[in-house]
Amino acid sequence: MNCSQSILRLHPNDNVAVALAPLHAGADLGGYAVGSDVPAGHKVACNALEIGVPVVKFGQLIGRATQRIHPGEHVHAHNLSFETGDIFAPVDDRKALALPEPTRTVFRGYVRPDGRVGTRNFVGILASVNCSASVCHAIAARANAELLPGLQNIDGFVPLVHDHGCGMQSSGEGFEALLRVLKGYRDHPNFGGVLIVGLGCEVNQVTLYKPTNWRDARLSTLNIQETSGSASAVAVALGKLSLISKAANEDMRTECPVSKLTLGMQCGGSDALSGITANPALGVASDILVGNGGTSILSETPEIFGAQHLLIHRSNAMTGRKIEGFLHWWKNYAAKNGATLDNNPSPGNKRGGLTTILEKSLGAVAKAGQSPLTNAYAYAERIDTSGLVYMDSPGYDPVAATGQVAAGANLIAFTTGRGSCFGAKPAPSLKIASNGGLAQSMPEEIDVDAGPIATGAVSIASKGLEIFERLIDLANGEKSKSEMFGYGDLEFVPWKIGATL
């Protein structure tokens, strides 16, 4: 990584560099001048590029020049594009980072009878269908006001509602995905108890979620149609929650190994520095966790498109085939809906300097660190192996994170370059800024600033260790910025696949 005061060249083979600060036309870059004003995070050409020449960043192709580009010229959507045929699988020649030793390898969590461990002790109120959503919110409001003050060991009553559960087939991809999500939340170790509320006539019947495990005494269901109406349903629910929460309030934190942590990794509102600072640092934190027996989940299949070789080359044959299968499904799914995977970067991504899906994907995959990929799972499928794993999901953060939590994540780490107002329940979320400007402008949202990596003030390894230590703090009960604000009730967004009937 070559770094000057104003630009950063990430790999010796790169023919573009990243602006660390706004560059003004005429500024000297050491042998050539800036051709026009270039925003921070955007790319400048290091040498002349003819039409059709590969543009290389991270040592990997990110697209091709669509016009002649002079040294020092801004490289972005006006002169760089990507075609599907540009995807190829070069050897990953990145040097392995030496991982720092963590100072702590234990945390204090809630041990559940099924062997999993919670980092929080919420009581969940899950809607089986959108028709019960308002009642679920009313139940939670009453429970938090009337029951919670007398319950010292419960973090709160959480209403988790969604916009489907009826008007759908009772089989197929969409229904199975919803079942996995709600069953995953029903059994989640961060819930000390759960109440599932339905209307009564929906496709997604509450009887599908009968207790099947240690929650027998801590799970109950309720159909509004079996009461006198909404107000009566709330009253009945409070009686049920009184019993559930009394049992959950007996739960206490005990010392547990970090191998009991499952980390869901997310990125959203990414910029060009995300793949240089925050994502690689999170990758180090993930490697430390995996090295101590824990589990990390990488997701967002549309955002690994073009960089999948970096994952497949370190997985076994079965896992590699699963990832290729996910991508094949997504190509067909996108085409059926008039979309393409190569048009993924959002307007915010582009304003932050990301031009093509290859460039975005190469940065996103950096969250995976350097651990072997041990398995791949369907959306919201229960994670049953340790190590670095992959879970299929959309790139839309709330949907992806909902699937990760359903799969068993008891912590979420979320990197951002443009800014994010995300938070999840019942899993606490740590937000990591890719640049110091964001950390300074949105201090109410950011838990860790990875910006100093870009200037060489700190190493990726040391920042990764800091992220790992902060995750341990969260696992012990310390609140993240998103928890302080109260995020999570409205960020529960199960993936909706298929037609609404």
Residues of each region from the PLM?
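Metallocofactor- and cofactor-centric catalytic cores in central/energy metabolism, strongly enriched
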Residues: 1-411, 418-501
